């Protein structure tokens, strides 16, 4: 039996340290970001490579594909060598697999990696979970601004590596790291709806909000946007055809192009808003309406003529749901 030492920094992880030849001091630089890597190899190979002084490579954590097992190799307080010029302020972890093969990115791996990120977010470094990248995956390098604190190797400046690449599901990862905020539910048949700044002020930075339009007994809901303005390509409104973020996505909107008029296929629409850490805008104004079937039961009144008839006669009744009807 091989004795495995447990990490004292992250309980679920195994502690298997890299040699001192492969990491160094942060020299006082504060930790402020997380780097997501794909090793282009196996879990065991990543551990072995970081323990080889000839590699001049290390990472704080390695995540296994099959079951999400994690090995810690460098203390978070130390500078691992994984993202070049951006090493001093980042914590890096490698994920087993290859960027061209999505089968390596298993649910177990996503969940284990996200749990690790959640732990680091709560460790006092000042890394907000909301600042996880959630945009489309891409090939090549794609530098993302400093507002985004949890992102891929390919998203940092001065890089040539392109991991985790086109097959990493950033939206999934964002949702695993971030709990859904409390939903504000609107049940009136119609009304006005504004961003958090109201009618006349901007929304705020670092927002994630959910609003559910679900009028009582409605068969459809319509949102009519009369104005719309968010920070283009940074602050987004998502509209879902249903009562959760797992419902079909109707659209994702940013900038000054209005969503226009949106109608649900059922009795609910969910609206989600996400803003980044800088630059706000006027937001939006919406009038919403809904179709609610008439649920008032019909009532009938019969006039008693007190007059016995031996021939054809007329009976008149009034239905609240329709016009008066006369029957013979």
Segments from the language model and where they lie:
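N-terminal catalytic cores of peptidoglycan-degrading enzymes
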Residues: 1-84
